[in-house]
């Protein structure tokens, strides 16, 4: 008599699935959790790292008996990529992104060796050892995840479809978006997960580099300004242009706001007669790229494409013999910021201080102070220094250190009807203004300390509506539903004693003139003593020939979208509008 043993079918185990998830999630979500807990960014990174790390479950589901081998091979790749990203964050306090790749590829050999040397410290070695030990421990806990046939194929396809194929199908075939844009969006979502941050980062870097190269080649082919003259003399000089971000003057005590949000600039204004505060300057577009395409070029609302066909302010200053510098705390290589990088690359030397993956991350503008001091020491006889700040860009609470929330919980001088979340945002914005005040004042003081021959101009690219206009429920910027606070900006001019001695001018009669930032290049040319075919003194706010014209705002590429700023209704009279 023969006995037959029936081999039991392996059973599905939730515990085995849990360990598999924990193993693959570990390599990406740990860093995202650290970033979130430290308050440097929100929850999107955690969400996307969890989702796209789950793709590695597919081969585990399909070949359960080989889970240890599969997990080891994949794990080595994930370990290397995620450890590099973790160490980068520990050293620099920033996520790895395509901006990092841009800076790395643009870095010379000496700078690259200094950069890599940061990775070889006892602290980093200990972190790497601990990280590796946890990864190995999780690997030892892995057990086969048995899903009966054909369900293992169904579940695997569902994962692939839900995370990859569905977004592609929806955007490409249903929403009719270009396939390239669909891939860009998907790559952006996958970026927090290892090793996608390197793969998608490189893909996005190449995409932006191609666009960047094309725009730079077109700019380099532009003819110089005709009949160009520099009538400012032959003395060595330094000119500084500081570009702020999302700062509306109505929330600055410098402009009459009852909260003391600009104490350092207030003090400078009272004690330094060479600091001139212009009261009636507005921006033409409430978006960074769009306004700088006008403010830094000859383009304006009526001629928005001139930035493509005529030299920029940076080109103009190089034509005048200036050595030019660009120091930025804005993101470098993103689809949105390509034009900023084009502008920066029109200068001789660039300092990119912000390689964050997202703008909604903690990055403080004090980053620019050290390179600014370094550039001030450069021996070039004629220097132009452009400093681009993050200013008071949303999220406002990420623009200043957590322990510097002076207005947290404050209800004084607050519009009526704000709920708790709106009040927090309102106060965060004032805290951001307070920190921005310190940065701008520090730049002026550092410049002044060098006993320079020159001047400094500061303006914000656009304003920001933060529950200022009744019914006090709007926050942000919307060109199709404009308010005054989206367009009202600070505009400051500081002139040195040496410059004032050789270029004596009284600006006191100019401070209340109605002016649009779109015409900045004419004011800058006037201040710098430059003339050329196309220079128009009637469009310089500091020129005796100045003529007030309609201050157009709106999208110039949209039919009948331009409107006169001065026809907008006033908000509450809490500050200068």
Curated annotation (Swiss-Prot):
Its EC number is 2.7.-.-. GO terms for molecular function: phosphotransferase activity, phosphate group as acceptor. Keywords: Cell inner membrane, Cell membrane, Lipid biosynthesis, Lipid metabolism, Lipopolysaccharide biosynthesis, Membrane, Transferase, Transmembrane, Transmembrane helix. One of its GO terms (biological process) is lipopolysaccharide core region biosynthetic process. The chain crosses the membrane at residues 17-37, 44-64, 69-89, 119-139, 154-174. NCBIfam families: CptA, PRK10649.1. This is Phosphoethanolamine transferase EptC.
């Amino acid at each position: 008599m023969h006995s037959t043993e029936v081999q039991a079918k392996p059973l599905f185990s939730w515990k085995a699935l849990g360990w598999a998830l924990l193993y693959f999630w570990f390599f990406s979500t740990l860093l995202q959790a650290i970033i979130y807990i430290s308050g440097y960014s929100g929850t999107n990174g955690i969400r996307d790292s969890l989702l796209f790390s789950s793709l590695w479950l597919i081969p585990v589901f399909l070949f359960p008996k080989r889970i240890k081998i599969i997990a080891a091979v994949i794990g080595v790749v994930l370990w290397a990529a995620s450890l590099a990203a973790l160490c980068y964050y520990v050293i620099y306090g920033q996520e790895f992104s395509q901006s990092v790749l841009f800076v790395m590829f643009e870095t010379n050999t000496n700078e690259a060796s200094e950069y890599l040397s940061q990775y070889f410290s006892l602290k980093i070695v200990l972190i790497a050892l601990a990280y590796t030990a946890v990864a190995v421990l999780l690997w030892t806990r892995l057990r086969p995840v048995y899903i009966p046939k054909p369900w293992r194929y169904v579940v695997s396809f569902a994962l692939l479809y839900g995370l990859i194929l569905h977004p592609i199908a929806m955007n490409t075939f249903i929403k009719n978006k270009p396939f390239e844009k669909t891939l860009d969006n998907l790559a952006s979502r996958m970026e927090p997960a290892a090793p996608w941050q390197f793969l998608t980062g490189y893909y996005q870097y190449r995409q932006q580099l191609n666009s960047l190269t094309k725009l730079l080649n077109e700019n380099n082919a532009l003819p110089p300004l005709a009949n160009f003259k520099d009538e400012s003399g032959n003395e060595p000089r330094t000119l500084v242009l500081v570009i702020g971000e999302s700062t509306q003057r109505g929330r600055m005590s410098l402009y009459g706001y009852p909260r003391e949000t600009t104490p350092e600039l207030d003090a400078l204004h009272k004690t330094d007669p060479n600091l001139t505060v212009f009261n009636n300057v507005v921006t033409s577009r409430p978006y960074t790229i769009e306004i700088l395409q006008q403010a830094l070029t000859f383009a304006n609302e009526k001629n928005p494409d001139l930035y493509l066909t005529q030299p920029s302010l940076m080109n103009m200053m190089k034509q005048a013999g200036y050595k030019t510098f660009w120091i930025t705390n804005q993101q470098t290589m993103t689809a949105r910021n390509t034009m900023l990088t084009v502008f920066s690359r029109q200068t001789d030397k660039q300092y990119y201080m912000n390689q964050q993956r997202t703008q909604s991350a903690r990055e403080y503008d004090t980053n620019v102070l050290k390179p600014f001091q370094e550039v001030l020491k450069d021996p070039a006889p004629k220097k132009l220094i452009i400093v681009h700040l993050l200013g008071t860009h949303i999220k406002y609470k990420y623009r200043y250190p957590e322990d510097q929330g002076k207005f947290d919980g404050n209800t004084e001088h607050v519009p009526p009807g704000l709920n708790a979340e709106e009040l927090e945002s309102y106060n965060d914005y004032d805290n951001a203004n307070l920190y921005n005040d310190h940065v701008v004042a520090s730049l002026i003081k550092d410049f002044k300390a060098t006993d320079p021959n020159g001047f400094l101009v500061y303006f914000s690219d656009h304003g920001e509506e933060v529950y200022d206009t009744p019914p006090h429920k709007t926050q942000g910027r919307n060109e199709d539903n404009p308010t005054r606070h989206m367009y009202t900006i600070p505009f400051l001019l500081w002139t040195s004693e040496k410059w004032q001695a050789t270029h004596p001018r009284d600006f006191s009669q100019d401070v209340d003139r109605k002016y649009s930032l779109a015409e900045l290049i004419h004011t800058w040319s006037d201040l710098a003593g430059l003339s050329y075919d196309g220079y128009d003194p009637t469009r310089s706010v500091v020129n005796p020939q100045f003529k007030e014209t309609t201050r157009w705002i709106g999208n110039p590429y949209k039919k009948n979208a331009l409107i006169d700023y001065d026809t907008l209704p006033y908000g509450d009279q809490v500050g200068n509008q």
